Amino acid sequence: PLFAANMFAHHLARQLGTQEEGIIYIHHDQQRLGGQAYGRFTPAQRRGAVFIGKKDYSSKNKYALSLQPTASCHLEFSLVIKFSSSRISPEKLTNILKRSRFAGGQIIEFLEITTHAENELETALKKIKTGFAILDRQDLLIEYQQRKQINRVQAFTQLLALKTDALRAFFNDQNLSWISATNLGYALLEPLTDQRAGIRQAQDQENTAHAYAEPLTGIIQYFSLGEILRRNTEAEDDTWHNLQKLLWTYHW
């Protein structure tokens, strides 16, 4: 959910009249939504009257609904957002959250919002205490591709298919686990244009630019926040002395 989290931070920044400069996503829990098909979990859109139109039925059986190519879940997470302004009102942010949505989903509950100075990132993370930070692991993908002498797509699919023992043996890292793929953004497939029928206009624009795009998928790792904070204080191991590298930043 990194891209969704970044867009959520972008939304909050616009509402606050400032800019976001990075996010840290801490995963706590997830409940996948879907159904069972032939004994296997299917993360398809749940069927309901609100999702049904004449085009939603199977082309082969006019009485059968086709599965929708979407997946959804309930999420519990913590989000650390770096804003360019140091004057952020927790009260104003609370009011914004009450009327906001995350990735199109309803925000059912959130805890007290706290603000910290830029040099207090460790304090902010210690307040969260537990969970799993999301790390960029494109280094694993590059190393796997180079050692196997295969193309990037082959390396991507093979790396994700490795079991934990094989993964740790290949990279000689006994702590390596919880590798996954996620959407990191989008790349345009064509030039932007506002000359297209059916474009949903932005709230503050008469003409909104539009372009078809493809997702950019990357390798990430879920890593224990508690372990990061523990290593942060170890003098002999400087891997996590700089907590700023947990920040995900985006470019347009």
Describe every region a protein language model picked out.
Residues 2-6, 56-61, 166-167:
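A short linear-motif detector with a strong N-terminal bias
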Residues 1-39:
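N-terminal ordered "arm"
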Residues 69-252:
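Internal, well-folded beta-alpha domain core
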